[in-house]
């Protein structure tokens, strides 16, 4: 007689973390993931705060301006404005000592701006982490997430680091089209931003990337060699086809004839298209960090002194300085009325050209 003894196998219950991990990473129409716990709530709150502010909230108490659709603004002039200078770097929490739980007072004090700025920054970081997470799940390299770090760096440097280096959130850009244009004028007038090499690298990166994208797209279209049956390019090819339908060799020969030099392989070509805009944006973010600390490395004082002493001496730099002084004299009184600024003669617009 044979007796079989079956060992009792104790089934281990999945932990709460495993259950959450399984649910978050489940295959669905919109991937959630752990990064989604940061991305979706923060993006929802940031966008909701912006729509609420531009629709209903005035900037009368912080800037002396109308800034909402309710007051008659349009899409270009509506904005969620920065808090007043008197608030300094307060986080302006709804339950904090400034608003004390009063939502109307919180909006009047610019609380929506800090709300949108902080939730917006965390939403962008969550989106970058989302790209990391999905790339890891499908075994891709993380270059998409690395590339997205560049616009995050620009956002954080302009909206958070720059005002932290100044006297308060007041000096950050407001969240609106005209508000950001005003901030650009402010940057030029008070920091001579267009002469800053870091700004120049940023412009070269963005415009260079646009040029590279245009050249790359046109070259691929020009070297298609397997025409499909569709009426146009968009319907001619199956998006899941395995084979390529354009010729890298033909493209290489074409640009070799145009410039005498061309990319020899796709890896170097696409890395360069990644490198140009990402490096440019990171350099501009570093430049804004310098402005936050009020660095004056690119003020050519010797030319300014000579232009002041010699009526016949003028350079493109001194012409720009003259315009900057006009911007300062015009903006400061409007932009900072609480300071009651009185300008001495030497800082008012002067010079030979105007």
UniProtKB/Swiss-Prot annotation:
A plastoquinone binds at residues 216, 263. Its EC number is 1.10.3.9. It comes from the Eukaryota. The modification N-acetylthreonine is found at residue 2. Pfam families: Photo_RC (PF00124). It is a multi-pass membrane protein. CDD domains: Photosystem-II_D2. GO terms for biological process: photosynthetic electron transport in photosystem II. Chlorophyll a ChlzD2 binds at residue 119. GO terms for molecular function: chlorophyll binding; electron transporter, transferring electrons within the cyclic electron transport pathway of photosynthesis activity; iron ion binding; oxygen evolving activity. The D1/D2 heterodimer binds P680, chlorophylls that are the primary electron donor of PSII, and subsequent electron acceptors. It shares a non-heme iron and each subunit binds pheophytin, quinone, additional chlorophylls, carotenoids and lipids. There is also a Cl(-1) ion associated with D1 and D2, which is required for oxygen evolution. The PSII complex binds additional chlorophylls, carotenoids and specific lipids. GO terms for cellular component: chloroplast thylakoid membrane; photosystem II. Belongs to the reaction center PufL/M/PsbA/D family. This is Photosystem II D2 protein. It comes from Chlorokybus atmophyticus (Soil alga).
């Amino acid at each position: 007689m044979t007796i079989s003894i079956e060992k009792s196998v104790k089934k281990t219950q999945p932990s709460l973390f495993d259950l959450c991990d399984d649910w978050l990473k489940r295959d669905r129409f919109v991937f959630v993931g752990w990064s989604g716990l940061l991305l979706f709530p923060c993006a929802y709150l940031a966008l909701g705060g912006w729509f609420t502010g531009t629709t209903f909230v005035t900037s009368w108490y912080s800037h002396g301006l109308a800034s909402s659709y309710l007051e008659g603004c349009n899409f270009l002039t509506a904005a969620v404005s920065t808090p007043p200078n008197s608030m300094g770097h307060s986080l302006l929490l709804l339950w904090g000592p400034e608003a004390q739980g009063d939502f109307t007072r919180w909006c009047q004090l610019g609380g929506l701006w800090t709300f949108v700025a902080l939730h917006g920054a965390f939403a962008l970081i969550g989106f970058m982490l989302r790209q990391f997470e999905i790339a890891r799940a499908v075994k891709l390299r993380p270059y998409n997430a690395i590339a997205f770090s560049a616009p995050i760096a620009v956002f954080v440097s302009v909206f958070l680091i720059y005002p932290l280096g100044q006297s308060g959130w007041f000096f950050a850009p407001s969240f609106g089209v005209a508000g950001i244009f005003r901030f650009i004028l402010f940057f030029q007038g008070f920091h001579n931003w267009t002469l800053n090499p870091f700004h120049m690298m940023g412009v070269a990166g963005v415009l260079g990337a646009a040029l590279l994208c245009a050249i790359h797209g046109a070259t691929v279209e020009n070297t298609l060699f397997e025409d499909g049956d569709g009426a146009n390019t968009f319907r001619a090819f199956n998006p899941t086809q395995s084979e390529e339908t354009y010729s890298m060799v033909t493209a290489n020969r074409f640009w070799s004839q145009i410039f005498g030099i061309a990319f020899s392989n796709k890896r170097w070509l696409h890395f360069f298209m990644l490198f140009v805009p990402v490096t440019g944006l990171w350099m501009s973010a570093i430049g804004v960090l310098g402005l936050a600390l009020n660095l004056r490395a690119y003020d050519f004082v010797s030319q300014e002194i000579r232009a002041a002493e010699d009526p016949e001496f003028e350079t493109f730099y001194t012409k720009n300085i003259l315009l900057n002084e006009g911007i300062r004299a015009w903006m400061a009184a409007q932009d900072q009325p609480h300071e009651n600024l009185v300008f001495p003669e030497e800082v008012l617009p002067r010079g030979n050209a105007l």
